[in-house]
């Protein structure tokens, strides 16, 4: 990936991994950051020599249209975020500089997917977009047991003298 700027506003860490898989040279770039409130994010001090992460990615991914290099772009994004209009609405209201870095990359990702036919826009014709995030599944698996545990604890607090209830809830909480 290339840029006339040599600093990227956004992720704290960048790792470049190279290797050969089935005789094909592969390069993987990992942009890593932690979720920080927009007020806590920092930019490079040298703004004349830096570029925002979403602009950097867009510039590099659109450049791939001029060659035969295919980029696989993986993003931490909930599947439910892709197939709902909530983010599209938020992103149409807020400018990139009003978004967290990760949100600005999500906006770039979502603006280049046509949900009606599950295709990538022609702007990124040599890019395959992939999304991954296990939190949707984890919420489904964890929500009911956690809700039950909280309800049980609340019930115990309301009826502290109910010994049968105490024993039953403690057993159920241990089983959960």
From Swiss-Prot:
Pfam families in the cross-refs: DUF5847 (PF19165)
Similarity remark? Belongs to the mimivirus R160 family.
Query: What name does the UniProt record give this protein?
Result: Uncharacterized protein R129
Q: Organism, per UniProt?
A: Acanthamoeba polyphaga mimivirus
């Amino acid at each position: 990936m290339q840029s006339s700027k040599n600093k990227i506003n956004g992720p704290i860490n960048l790792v470049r991994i190279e290797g050969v898989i089935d005789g094909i040279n592969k390069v993987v770039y990992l942009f890593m950051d932690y979720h920080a409130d927009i007020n806590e994010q920092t930019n490079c001090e040298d703004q004349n020599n830096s570029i925002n992460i979403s602009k950097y990615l867009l510039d590099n991914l659109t450049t791939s249209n001029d060659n035969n290099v295919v980029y696989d772009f993986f993003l931490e994004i909930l599947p439910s975020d892709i197939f709902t209009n909530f983010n599209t609405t938020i992103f149409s209201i807020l400018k990139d500089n009003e978004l967290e870095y990760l949100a600005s990359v999500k906006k770039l990702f979502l603006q280049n997917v046509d949900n009606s036919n599950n295709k990538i826009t022609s702007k990124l014709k040599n890019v395959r977009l992939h999304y991954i995030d296990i939190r949707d599944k984890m919420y489904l698996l964890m929500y009911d047991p956690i809700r039950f545990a909280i309800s049980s604890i609340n019930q115990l607090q309301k009826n502290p003298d109910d010994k049968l209830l105490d024993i039953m809830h403690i057993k159920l909480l241990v089983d959960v």
